[in-house]
Amino acid sequence: MAEERIQKIMVLFEQPENESRLERLTGKLMQVRDIRGTIGRMAMEQVLDDLELFELKTFALCSEEIRGLVEEWRIVLLPELEPVVRLLDPEGNRIPHFYIYDTYSAELARLRAEIKQKSLQGAEERELEALYVQSVVLEDKVREELSVQLRPYHDDLKQALEAVGLLDVVLAKARQAIRGQLTLPQIPEEGEMVFEGLFHPQIREILEQEGRAFQAVDLKLEKGTTVITGANMAGKTVLLKSVQLAQYL
């Protein structure tokens, strides 16, 4: 299945009309952070703090953009996280920022406005502190309510994070395969093993940096013992390393 995804992406890379979308996709994948810890706290039904709510909002926004970019390609299945976005972005700004917005609580909005007004009027510190404590209690209540409202989306968030991680890996492998002129091997269950244009990627890269070329090798290995002969420094060790690396990969 992973091989099919890689091949599909390699085909997409070869089509010029996909270049802009693939660049945007790469940029979005670079913005994704590992939020497994936050998702784990959701599973334990804990109250999330502002940083964790920010992580969920940022990931949900990013995942939705990625879903829009790859949905028609059918490379990975990304669940819809728009309900998560609506919970954490009540004002609909769709920016990677989180705050206990006034929209969450009319009482909190009133308290904040009162604190601001009394501060401008030079109210006593004790009075302002009392109002501030009330606002903190209301903010904690909002966090608790949000944490409860987000719990039904735990599985979707977990699935989306795994799918985005898989997409990142197969995209990188496809890009590496194209740049390195790599092919998907056909592995026989028995019989001879054939390598065409075999090379060692690291050694080839070093030679190219020095303005030299790597001599690719065609090789057929049959069941039994194979003896490699040749002059000193003729490439026997490099050939063995290339075969070993190809076999390992």
Tell me what each language-model feature is:
Residues 162-234, 247-249:
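Conserved NTPase motor "head" modules and their coupling/switch loops across ABC/AAA+ ATPases, GTPases
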